């Protein structure tokens, strides 16, 4: 299955990686690794994560307070948010897959 980030989700991901790398290079690498693991889980088992809104699901990022919010559009997994779980709940709800 293909994976695609909407532009706002890509910005969130880039900003989160940058912030963690500013804290320490090692932390940035760990964050990147955990997000990549979450993406692999989604690609392997797209329907296994919790359904949170209509056709959207959330895959938790291990060891970090982030969730990947995604929908499944035919043969593509569309990540609509890389959401920090302690900020602005459901801010991503109006984003389109």
Model-derived regions: residue spans:
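Arg/Lys-rich, positively charged N-terminal/basic patches that mediate binding to nucleic acids
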Residues: 1-32
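Short linear/disordered segments characteristic of secreted peptide precursors
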Residues: 8, 46, 59, 87-89
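Solvent-exposed interaction patches of small proteins and small membrane subunits
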Residues: 18, 28-30, 50, 55, ...
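Short proline/glycine- and basic residue-enriched helix-capping loop/turn segments at helix->loop/beta transitions
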Residues: 39-43
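Basic/aromatic recognition patch in beta-strand/loop cores that engages polyanionic ligands
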Residues: 44-77
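Enriched for short, Lys/Arg-rich terminal
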Residues: 67, 71-97
């Amino acid at each position: 299955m293909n994976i695609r980030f909407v532009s706002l989700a890509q910005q969130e991901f880039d900003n989160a990686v940058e912030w963690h790398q500013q804290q320490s290079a090692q932390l940035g690498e760990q964050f990147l690794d955990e997000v990549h693991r979450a993406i692999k889980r989604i690609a392997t088992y797209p329907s296994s994560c919790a359904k949170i809104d209509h056709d959207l699901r959330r895959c938790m990022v291990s060891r970090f307070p982030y969730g990947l919010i995604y929908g499944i559009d035919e043969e593509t997994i569309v990540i609509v948010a890389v959401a920090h779980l302690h900020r602005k709940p459901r801010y991503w709800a109006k984003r389109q897959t």
